Design a protein with these regions (language model features):
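Beta-strand/loop substructures that line and gate deep hydrophobic ligand-binding cavities in soluble
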Residues: 3, 98-150
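Hydrophobic ligand-binding cavity/cleft-lining segments
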Residues: 1-57
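A short, structured loop/turn motif at beta-sheet edges
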Residues: 35-36, 60-61, 91-96, 112-121
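Hydrophobic/aromatic beta-strand elements that line small-molecule binding cavities or substrate pockets
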Residues: 29, 55-56, 86-92, 107-114
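Hydrophobic pocket/interface hotspot
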Residues: 38-39, 48, 66, 90, ...
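Short beta-edge strand/loop motif at the mouth of beta-sheet-based domains
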Residues: 26-27, 45-83, 160-167
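Intrinsic-disorder/low-complexity, polar/charged segments enriched in Ser/Thr/Lys/Arg/Asp/Glu/Gln
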Residues: 22-28, 65, 85, 98, ...
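Short, highly charged C-terminal tails/helix-capping segments
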Residues: 152-177
């Protein structure tokens, strides 16, 4: 049985301009498990390694500093090094429902809302200054969230989120226009 990368890209992220002139890329995903299970996929370093676009060890305390290092795949594909590390800070945390942090000048907000059916809604928002960030960020987060969804549902992932992001990139180009 093959577990190919998802082919449906009908759940594209939406881009809006914020009141302060920045841009917010927002995704919603219904996850088949409760927030406690999704929280593990968001915060466990081993699970993050499969989908998050950096190596990061969370210190889940408000104000904690974060370091985002290139992944092994980014080092291989794009020649990134330790010199390409970036930094951020935890701004809000309420396990297992809310994680917000900065990553350089960007803000990433992960909200998990449980429902009565034992599932949860993930609302992810990436806020940034440059509209040109929307296309590559949108394709990358879309692909990463597909891996996160599979992890939460205990489905195997035998596709590359990097390849998947490349396949989605044309769908996201319109966001940067």
């Amino acid at each position: 049985m093959s577990h190919d990368a998802p082919t449906s890209s009908d759940r594209l992220g939406a881009l809006v301009q914020t009141d302060d002139g920045r841009y917010a890329l927002r995704f919603e995903r219904r996850l088949p498990r409760p927030a406690t299970r999704a929280w593990q996929a968001l915060t466990d370093p081993d699970r993050l390694a499969a989908w998050f676009p950096a190596v990061v060890a969370w210190d889940l305390r408000p104000g904690a500093e974060l370091r985002f290092d290139p992944t092994p795949e980014q080092r291989r594909r794009y020649g990134l090094t330790d010199q390409d590390a970036t930094f951020g800070r935890i701004t809000e945390v309420d396990p297992p429902h809310l994680l917000e942090h900065t990553w350089g000048a960007e803000t990433l907000r992960w909200e998990l809302h449980d429902d009565d059916a034992g599932t949860c809604l993930l609302v992810f928002t990436n806020t940034f200054d440059d509209r040109g960030t929307a296309a590559p960020a949108g394709a990358g987060w879309h692909a990463g969230l597909e891996v996160l969804e599979a992890q939460v549902d205990d489905r195997p992932v035998d596709w590359s989120p990097f390849d998947r992001a490349e396949a989605l990139s044309a769908r996201y180009e319109t966001l940067a226009d």
